[in-house]
């Protein structure tokens, strides 16, 4: 009987030493993990929706045909590096402003006029998130470039009209070029076909901040229908020709975003520069 009592006491001691200790350790680990999750930024995840884009209420009508088979505008490329490693959008805007007669440089545009925000506070359609001087920043969408351009032109006392042409066909953009207006156009880096919608955070207003991985911005300034090419001022490459069909596909992958800066006399009848609506591009998440 004494032996059984001793064995029972020994078993109880083993339980207290190992099982209670392990349970306490597990509890501490769980609590630590919980604290970490509460303070960690939301991860980048594949977004399964589409991004609503703001565009003009009345878009230019797609032309039945282009007035010329070949057009080359004398737009000069502006390179984003080394000063603006993630500033392709504001660099393309700078090239467009230079063409319109404004001798502004990309750094001035980035530092004084580009609408910027810290992460977590806004979406990429409302501000450039991060700093274009930082290689780890993100970028922005067409509405940000529209407002940035409008602010700059107003500060200079100019009367050029800035229009968001998001949703227009590439043929419509080529019509703009044929009529003397280069187009700030979103495409992809090196025309890669790999594009992903990535969710990063939800803003205080409840909007999802979703960025298109590999998005890029160029200034469309020419085309050659016979060679099936478009000419762009690429902030990474300079003035280059790209295959027209491939460029059109990449333009569609990033929701057909485009912006023009032009004289009011070049606006088509019925166009407006003030009213906006929200459209949902019919592009599935990659």
What is the role of each PLM region?
Residues 110-114, 165-171:
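Short linear loop/turn motifs
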Residues 73-75, 164-167:
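Short loop/edge segments at beta-strand edges and connector loops
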Residues 199-212, 218-286:
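Noncatalytic regulatory segments and standalone regulatory/sensor domains
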Residues 2-5, 10-151, 155, 189-191, ...:
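Active-site-adjacent structural segments surrounding the nucleophilic cysteine of cysteine proteases
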């Amino acid at each position: 009987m004494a032996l059984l009592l001793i064995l029972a006491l020994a078993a109880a001691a083993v339980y207290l030493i190992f099982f209670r200790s392990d349970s306490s350790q597990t509890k501490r680990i769980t609590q630590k993990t919980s604290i970490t999750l509460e303070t960690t930024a939301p991860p980048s995840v594949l977004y399964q929706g589409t991004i609503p884009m703001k565009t003009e209420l009345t878009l230019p009508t797609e032309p039945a045909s282009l007035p010329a088979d070949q057009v080359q505008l004398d737009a000069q490329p502006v390179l984003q590096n080394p000063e603006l490693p993630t500033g392709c959008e504001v660099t393309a805007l700078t090239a467009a402003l230079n063409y319109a007669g404004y001798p502004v440089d990309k750094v001035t545009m980035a530092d004084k006029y580009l609408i910027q925000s810290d992460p977590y506070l806004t979406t990429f359609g409302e501000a450039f998130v991060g700093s274009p001087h930082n290689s780890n920043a993100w970028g922005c969408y067409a509405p940000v470039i529209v407002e940035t351009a409008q602010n700059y032109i107003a500060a200079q006392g100019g009367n050029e009209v800035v229009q968001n042409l998001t949703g227009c066909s590439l043929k419509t953009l080529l019509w703009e070029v044929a009529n003397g207006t280069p187009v700030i156009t979103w495409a992809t880096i090196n025309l890669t076909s790999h594009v992903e919608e990535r969710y990063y955070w939800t803003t205080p207003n409840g909007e999802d901040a979703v960025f298109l991985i590999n998005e890029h911005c160029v200034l469309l300034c020419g085309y050659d229908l016979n060679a099936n090419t478009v000419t762009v001022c690429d902030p990474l490459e300079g003035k280059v020709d790209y295959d027209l069909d491939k460029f059109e596909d990449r333009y569609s992958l990033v929701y057909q975003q485009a912006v023009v800066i032009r004289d009011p006399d070049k606006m088509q009848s019925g166009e407006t520069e003030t009213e906006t609506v929200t459209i949902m591009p019919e592009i599935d998440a990659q």
